[in-house]
């Protein structure tokens, strides 16, 4: 334990908290333009073709963003909204595209968990 005199001479250093989503710059979401839309394979125990896109954000960052849900309508030059949230089995993918916002359409035929995929309530 440090004495009061030692703390007066050299105070304790505050720990700096590093952000998991630096490209968002303390914003909840950011807008960007798709520069490349492609599929990639996940890490070892899993196997799939995960849909991802490279996005150039309005603040100049270029990030990789995951496209959730079954099927999508994104192409190069599509304007998308991205949010934070990593994909555990895709290294380097720390962002998700927001479905149902800007050029990214919601998921067709989605009945459950609709709010996460930009789907309006179905007519009953």
Swiss-Prot record:
SUPFAM superfamilies: Nucleic acid-binding proteins (SSF50249). Pfam families: Ribosom_S12_S23. Keywords: Methylation, Ribonucleoprotein, Ribosomal protein, RNA-binding, rRNA-binding, tRNA-binding. The modification 3-methylthioaspartic acid is found at residue 89. The keyword ATP-binding does not apply. One of its GO terms (cellular component) is small ribosomal subunit. InterPro entries: NA-bd_OB-fold (IPR012340), Ribosomal_uS12 (IPR006032), Ribosomal_uS12_bac (IPR005679). GO terms for molecular function: rRNA binding; structural constituent of ribosome; tRNA binding. GO terms for biological process: translation. Belongs to the universal ribosomal protein uS12 family. With S4 and S5 plays an important role in translational accuracy. Interacts with and stabilizes bases of the 16S rRNA that are involved in tRNA selection in the A site and with the mRNA backbone. Located at the interface of the 30S and 50S subunits, it traverses the body of the 30S subunit contacting proteins on the other side and probably holding the rRNA structure together. The combined cluster of proteins S8, S12 and S17 appears to hold together the shoulder and platform of the 30S subunit. Part of the 30S ribosomal subunit. Contacts proteins S8 and S17. May interact with IF1 in the 30S initiation complex. This is Small ribosomal subunit protein uS12.
